[in-house]
């Protein structure tokens, strides 16, 4: 670790077509084995499917879905005196967005369906409406944090 000060935070790049940082974050998380062009294809097909399903701006649906899934608080395991407690911790917006994207992709991978673009578009539309596996994961995390509120002083 450097003693001179903190390093500057890198700004997230935006994707070539929509010029959107969220789309680029999604592409980087869906990426497997360095196949970025395939990741872009999947995302753009999913965005087209969202456009066809909802007949609204697909980027606003994406934003709304990520905003709906982003957790405010999470639990972290902390060992205190021989026993492990789940300690509720508030998380920042960047980390919350990263968690939301991870949960959305995990939920869409679990879905039954033809291909990833179809599954991802379905999950994003459901999350924007307030349902789906990713929303359930967020609510479960918030319930865990609420149940372990007594351990908040261990932070």
UniProtKB/Swiss-Prot annotation:
One of its GO terms (molecular function) is mRNA binding. Signal peptide: none annotated. Keywords: Chloroplast, Plastid, Ribonucleoprotein, Ribosomal protein, RNA-binding, rRNA-binding. It comes from the Eukaryota. It is found in: Plastid, Chloroplast. Gene3D superfamilies: Ribosomal protein S7 domain. GO terms for biological process: ribosomal small subunit assembly; translation. Its main location: plastid. One of the primary rRNA binding proteins, it binds directly to 16S rRNA where it nucleates assembly of the head domain of the 30S subunit. Part of the 30S ribosomal subunit. This is Small ribosomal subunit protein uS7cz/uS7cy. It comes from Solanum tuberosum (Potato).
């Amino acid at each position: 670790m450097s003693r001179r000060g903190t390093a500057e935070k890198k700004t997230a790049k935006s994707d070539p077509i929509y010029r959107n940082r969220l789309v680029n974050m999604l592409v980087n998380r869906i990426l497997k084995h360095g196949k970025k062009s395939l990741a872009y294809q999947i995302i753009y097909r999913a965005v087209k499917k969202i456009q066809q399903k909802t007949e609204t701006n697909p980027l606003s649906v994406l934003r709304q879905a990520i905003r709906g899934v982003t957790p405010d608080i999470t639990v972290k395991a902390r060992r205190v005196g021989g026993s492990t407690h789940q300690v509720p911790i508030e998380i920042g917006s960047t980390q919350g967005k990263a968690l939301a994207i991870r949960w959305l992709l995990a939920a869409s991978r679990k879905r039954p369906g033809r291909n990833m673009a179809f599954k991802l578009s379905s999950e994003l539309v459901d999350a924007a409406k307030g349902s789906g596996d990713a929303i359930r994961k967020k609510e479960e995390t918030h319930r865990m944090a609420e149940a372990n509120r007594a351990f908040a002083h261990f932070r």
